[in-house]
Every structure is written in C-alpha cells, then in structure tokens.
C-alpha cells in the first residue's frame, strides 16, 4: 500500500480505550469507571516531582491509561483453561505476571516518543522484591513504580464507601507500606504532589480536564503500519472480551478494508475503514458476558442491553477530537436503511456509503465466522441472506451484490 499518513488524536483515542477497559474491571473487581484516567492523572502529577519532560509525561500518561490493557486476554485464557475465573482465588496474585507480560507485548504496537520498556511489565512489582517478578525498586523503572502506587491507591479509594475518609485511609496505607509495596521516594512524591483536593476532583469529575491540560492531546501523523498496529491493539482487546466473538473485530476490519480497496477507495480511506472496523464493537466492553455468551435466545430486556453496545461505541469514540467520521462508520453498523436499526434508527438518506458497507461487512463476518455455538456459514449462503435483507430494505443492495464477488 502506498505510504500516506492519517492524522489521529492518539492520546484521546487511547484515553477512550481506557474507559472501555474500565468497564471490564468494573465487571470483574468492582473498580469504578474512569480508573485508568484517575491513575493517569495521579501518575502525571507525581511525575512533576522529578521534573519529567513533556514527551515522557505523555508516554507515562499513555502507560497509565493502558496499564491493564491485557485484562481481557488474561481472563479469556483463564476461562478457557479453568472453565471460569474466581477472583477470590489466592493464586491470582501469582498469575499477575501473565497479565503484565501480555500487556507489555501489546503496547509495543503503540507509537511512544520515549523508551517505556518494562513499564507495563513491572507495574505490579513491590519495592521489597516480593512482586510477580521479584524485582526490588532499584531494578524497576520509575514509571512502573509510579503506576503501581497510583493503581493501588485508586483501587483502595474506589472500594471505600465513605467519601470523607478515602484520603485518610489511603495515606495510612501508604505510610504502612513504605519500603514494602512502595519505595520511599514514590511515597514522598505522592504526599508532595497529591492532596485531598485531588480526591475531590475525582468525585466532581474535574480531574479529567486537568489531566488533558497537563498532557495536551495533539494530533499525530501516523503511517499505515502504525495505524494498523493501533487498530489491531483495539480489536484484540475487544475480541478477547468473549470467545463467542473471538476475532470478529479483526475480521470486520480486514474485510472492510478489502471491500474499500476493491471498489477503488484511496489509501487513506482504506486505512480509515480498517480502523473503523477494528473499533466498531468497542462498546461491547460495557456489555456483560452473561449476555454476550448466553447460548439461548435473549429476552427483550437482554436484547435491549445488547443493542446498547452500538451506542456505547458512539459515546466512547465521541471523546476523540476530530474523529466523527470514523466514529460514525464504526458505531452505525447496526443501522438499517428502512429506519429499523439501532442505536439511532437512521434511515437510508441519513446513512452514507461507508456506514452501509460496515453494516453489510459486520453481518457477513458474523455469519461466516465459527463460534463456540455454531459453525461458520458458507460464502454463498451468507450472500443469499444479505441479498434477501437488501430486498427487505435492511441493507444496501449494490454493496450486497459486490460482496459476493469481492469476498469470493
């Protein structure tokens, strides 16, 4: 593919991703939403203690936002091996190293400006060397030590019911764990740079704008390989959410780009279609697995919750600056030309070609892919179903017709 570059608000996009990841943590361990952004804000505040320069500060924020990026992958493997996961299992702490290894490998896809090697890998290490990899604080990168402290502090604060006591409880814990979980320097930095007012900003929501003021979100020009890496990063996180939809996002991304190239889109639009395909189901991170993995027909109430995922995708991607086009291509994949789709009930005159393509590609991928409860449907049978849907006014007939030859 010819080298052309796409302009993306990468920090904003990764911040939106952290909100989606937080939905998984909220479902699993009852940590409140915006966990990643709170960890990022405290981490950036603490880093000022060491006068960390702007590029490194941005990279720290990204690492903090994505510190639990491998959570869905880790859980998926545990579920597959053990037919479930018990969060009270005492051996989970010993298995934390897997989540760190996967996370370190995943963020290699992100275009950092500075060296962040081992930051995610060692973000659960203890100062006294009793963490997953037995590294003492002197062997652990500063950013990993900062994220470890802020991650634990936010988990404690999130679990404490009484707002007025959160600060005192966290401070007592840090003093007690000085030299054990956390090194003296990081504890000192916390008390110098974080205050009770910081916790108040978590309650009233003002911390998020303060975070972006400290870490400006500037659009970056990215080439195709970088764009694909970012897209694949998101798709893998979504697809690991449930084995019932494993590889679905990757499949939609690949086929959306394949179709766009087939009908003559230019390089940048092919890239954007790939990215939109990778992101189209990011809203499913906010839908419980009891619904995603239910083998029986969903009740009306359950189906309404399932349908919410498209709206969640729209809301998540709305956080990204100048991303409206890709947001719409991604989020409107369940809209129908006759106005009977969701989340907005848009009609034919409100749906552009890219949104219509994504709707058809999503259906094609869902029908042809193999899932735990069904075998994949043949190309011909799937195309027949799409043609029938076109006749009924659900999808675009021309796109359905071209898919028959494009994906053959």
PLM regions: where:
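Histidine- and acidic-residue-rich, metal-dependent catalytic cores
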Residues: 2-408
């Amino acid at each position: 593919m010819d080298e052309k570059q796409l302009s993306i608000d990468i920090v904003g996009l990764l911040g939106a991703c952290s909100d989606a990841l937080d939905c998984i943590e909220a479902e699993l361990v009852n940590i409140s939403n915006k966990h990643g952004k709170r960890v990022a804000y405290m981490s950036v505040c603490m880093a000022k203690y060491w006068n960390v320069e702007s590029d490194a500060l941005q990279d720290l924020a990204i690492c903090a936002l994505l510190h639990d990026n491998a959570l869905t992958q880790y859980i998926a493997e545990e579920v597959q091996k053990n037919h479930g996961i018990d969060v009270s299992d005492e051996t989970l702490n010993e298995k934390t190293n897997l989540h760190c290894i996967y996370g370190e490998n995943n963020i290699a896809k992100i275009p950092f400006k500075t060296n962040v090697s081992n930051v995610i890998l060692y973000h659960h290490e203890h100062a006294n060397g009793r963490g997953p990899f037995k590294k003492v604080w002197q062997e652990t990168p500063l950013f990993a030590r900062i994220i470890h402290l802020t991650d634990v502090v936010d988990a404690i604060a999130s679990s404490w019911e009484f707002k007025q006591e959160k600060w005192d409880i966290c401070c007592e814990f840090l003093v007690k764990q000085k030299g054990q979980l956390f090194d003296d320097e990081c504890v000192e930095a916390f008390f110098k740079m974080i205050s009770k007012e910081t916790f108040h900003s978590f309650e009233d929501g003002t911390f998020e704008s303060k975070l972006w003021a400290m870490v400006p979100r500037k659009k970056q020009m990215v080439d195709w390989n970088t764009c694909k890496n970012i897209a694949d990063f998101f798709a893998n996180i979504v697809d690991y959410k449930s084995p019932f939809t494993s590889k679905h996002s990757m499949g939609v991304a690949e086929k959306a780009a394949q179709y766009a190239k087939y009908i003559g889109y230019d390089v940048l639009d092919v890239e954007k279609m790939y990215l939109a395909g990778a992101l189209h189901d990011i809203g499913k991170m906010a839908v419980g697995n009891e619904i995603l993995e239910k083998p029986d027909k969903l009740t009306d109430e359950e189906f309404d919750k399932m349908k919410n995922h498209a709206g969640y995708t729209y809301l998540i991607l709305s956080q990204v600056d100048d991303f409206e086009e890709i947001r719409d291509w991604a989020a409107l994949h369940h809209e129908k030309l006759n106005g009977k789709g969701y989340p907005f009930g848009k009609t034919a005159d409100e749906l552009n070609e890219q949104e219509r393509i994504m709707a058809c590609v999503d259906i094609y991928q869902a029908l042809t892919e193999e899932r735990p409860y069904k075998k994949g449907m043949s190309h011909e049978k799937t195309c027949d179903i799409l043609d029938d849907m076109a006749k009924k006014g659900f999808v675009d007939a021309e796109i359905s017709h071209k898919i028959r030859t494009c994906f053959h």
